[in-house]
Amino acid sequence: MIVSGLSGSGKSVALKTFEDLDYYCSDNLPVELLPDFVRSRLRGNPLGDQRLAVGIDVRSRSDLTQLAQWRQAAQEYGIEARLLFFEASDEALLKRYADTRRRHPLSQLGLALPEAITRERELTAPLRAQADAIIDTSALNVHQLRRRVVTEFALGNSDRLSLLFESFAYKRGVPAEADFVFDARVLPNPHWDPELRPLTGRDAGVRDYLDKEPDVIRYSAQIVDLLDTWLPRLRNDTRSYVTIAFGCTGGKHRSVYLAERMARHAREQGWPEVATFHREQD
């Protein structure tokens, strides 16, 4: 697993999570040293079943464009190197640097923080372009990010397609990593029922309310039809992860309900790796 992205976006949290899950981790490794590093680890483990996670970013001052060539060569030898790219909005990164008072790695070039962030986006663009998954952490805290890594990536089997059903609030932005986005704001809102307002889409009261609504029944059936038609096509693609996101006003009732309902349907259809993530609740 190759972990890359913008400074302050959560790469260190991701690597620590992989380490806790028994990955052998190395951070800030120059791209040109990656082949020797992998070979040395495999020689020390003849069975070849050791899980590795490597952090690569602008701190190494490497030619990041070399990574694509190495991944292609590694694949020819039966080594799958998946690339996760972490990013966040400028606003989120600026706030995190203000809170931690850390220096940006590119500040040594004499750049102000906003300029350093912009320059880093340019330098890491080749990595972002070839990423297997892009994770926007702007709206995530440390605990949410850790849970996200565990549920969507760390427990996955590399030869199977992992599905993540995510709920979110539109007022906090659409998840940048979403492959499919469905707007649940067209559905009746349990928020206006005083008894249902404090509940979430995971509670029986909200489920019972929405299960009876004709628009919900029709909308859910149309989503099921679309996903049942197209998700199997992606199984034969080179991608390892698919994120299906559902949004509503507050990310509490309708979006959570749909994410849970579709995840349940996916499991019933035999998909082996299905996870849910409720951005505004978890």
Swiss-Prot record:
Claim: ATP-binding is one of the keywords in the record: yes
Record bears the keyword Ligase: no
Alphabetical UniProt keywords: ATP-binding, GTP-binding, Nucleotide-binding
Residues binding ATP: G5, L6, S7, G8, S9, G10, K11, S12
Pfam families for this protein: PapZ_C, RapZ-like_N
Binding annotation for GTP: D57, V58, R59, S60
Top-level taxonomic group: Bacteria
One example GO MF annotation: ATP binding
Segments crossing the lipid bilayer: none
Recorded family membership: Belongs to the RapZ-like family.
Protein function: Displays ATPase and GTPase activities.
Stated name of the protein: Nucleotide-binding protein XCC2806
